[in-house]
Amino acid sequence: MMNGMRVSFLNRFLRMTAVVLAAAFAFLLAGCGGSSTSTSFTWFVDNIPANLDPQVATKAEDVIACENLYGGLVRRNASGELVPDLCERWEISSDGLTYTFYLKSGLTYTGTKGAATDYAITAEDFVYAFRRVFDPQTASPYAVEFSAIQNSAAVLDGTADPGTLGVSAIGELTLVFRLSERDDTFLSKLTLPGAMPCDEAFFESTRGTYGLSSASTLSSGSFYIYNWTASGLFLRRSAASPLVNNLRLVQNTSNTDKSAAQLIADEKCSAALDDTAEATSLQSVEYSDTTWALLFNASEVSVFAVASLRQALAGIAL
């Protein structure tokens, strides 16, 4: 029996071998304690990431990088549950139309090679990020995901001022979303790259190159950019951890005709993207059009028969 989990998101077809799932499962176990030895994870991708602007990233390699570079309001834990990330807690009104988040104090962005910065992460950064999502000039693919936000359609088509968008800051650490209609998936959508914070002053300082180079990218997540060259994107974890500490996204240039399964067997990478749809004994994660799905063998004898594990792997960030 196969069990699929689907969430609207990407707009192109990809296929990633399930070795990713096996590796993620191993990292979950490692997270329970034990060795602090540095662990590396290597992705073979079609192209080196080129755009790390989370509000516009859509290509697979860019999204993979953004999901690890940026932290948002919420994340999924090892049990697949939504838990606070950059916020301490949140409240939802009884009618489901108002979401209030209370951010952690003292958070700052991280620069290239782990350099400390003076850019504090505040509620205004999320306000600015969502204004960018609904700025017609941004052409963000995430606007459709957050269409329930009050006045979003009018702001997007240019008939309303961005200041009327239903996202506001009350002081530095309180963020409020007002929806025009109930969206029971709203919290889950806040894990998408488009919902990641963006410091307006830093964005303006990049003069149109935000997310296009190491110098024009700041991290708010678990990893920061260590190096970004024609050879690949190399990320390191901000704090020592028994989980993955080094994440490498490199282009497969040795033999583009190889399937993902062959790449993993021959090139010793941790994961690879494949659009051949070739039959394999490995499980796969599929991304198609505006829907992506994780497919698991959920038979009684499979480790993936445990629903909580499937849920965790559906939302895990390395």
Model-flagged regions — what are they?
Residues 123-128, 172-176, 246, 266, ...:
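Alpha-helical secondary-structure segments
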Residues 162-164, 172-173, 178-244:
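Gly/Pro-rich hinge or "lid" segments in bacterial periplasmic/extracellular proteins
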Residues 89-145, 303-305, 310:
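Aromatic- and charge-enriched surface segment that lines or borders ligand/interaction sites
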Residues 80-108, 139-201:
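Surface-exposed ligand-recognition segments of extracellular binding domains, strongest
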Residues 28-31:
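C-terminal motif of bacterial Sec signal peptides marking the signal peptidase cleavage site
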Residues 38-50, 98-102, 126-129, 175-176, ...:
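Short, well-ordered beta-strand elements
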Residues 44-94, 218-219:
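N-terminal lobe/hinge region of extracytoplasmic solute-binding protein
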Residues 204, 231-279:
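Ligand-site clamp/hinge motif
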